[in-house]
Curated annotation (Swiss-Prot):
Residues 118-139 are annotated as: Disordered. GO terms for biological process: translation. Transmembrane segments: none annotated. PANTHER family: 40S RIBOSOMAL PROTEIN S14/30S RIBOSOMAL PROTEIN S11 (PTHR11759). One of its GO terms (molecular function) is rRNA binding. GO terms for cellular component: ribonucleoprotein complex; ribosome. This is Small ribosomal subunit protein uS11. It comes from Thermococcus sibiricus (strain DSM 12597 / MM 739). Pfam families: Ribosomal_S11. The keyword RNA-binding applies. The keyword rRNA-binding applies.
Length: 139
């Protein structure tokens, strides 16, 4: 076998980051950091990419913000991310907003490898009193 026929398997060096996705019903924030979370690599929000305030939390805004964050991260050498999804939590809503799923899908389609996806919504262990009064919100 000649040297030309031997293929050298050069393994591409993988550099991982963490994509923190905060999805509320008012906005979606995509924040890509290094693995420790100490250094910000890219940060985009739904409000940065759309004009109307009502569209900040939409899946479309989340998709564009995630795509731009992924492009910026890939320029800086990140080629895989672990995803941490967070809703407002605490005494507020514990469900992620409409942009969370769209943001995850956009990160994957932008060419980033997806590692773990985990929910890091803060859950109270009997913390502060929820708003609405003793009898709750009467609709």
């Amino acid at each position: 076998m000649s040297e030309e026929q031997q293929t050298v398997n050069i393994k591409k060096k993988e550099k991982w980051g963490v994509a923190h996705i905060y999805a509320s019903y008012n906005n979606t924030i995509i924040h890509i950091t290094d693995l420790t979370g100490a250094e910000t690599i890219s940060k985009w929000s739904g409000g940065m990419v759309v004009k109307a305030d009502r569209d900040e939390s939409s899946p479309y805004a989340a998709m564009i913000a995630a795509r731009r964050a992924a492009e910026e991260a890939m320029e800086k050498g990140i080629n895989g991310v672990h995803i941490k999804v967070r809703a407002p939590g605490g005494s507020k809503s514990k469900n992620p907003g409409p942009g969370a799923q769209a943001a995850i899908r956009a990160l994957a389609r932008a060419g980033l490898r997806i590692g773990r996806v985990e929910d890091v919504t803060p859950i109270p262990h009997d913390g502060t009193r929820p708003k609405g009064g003793r009898r709750g919100r009467r609709v």
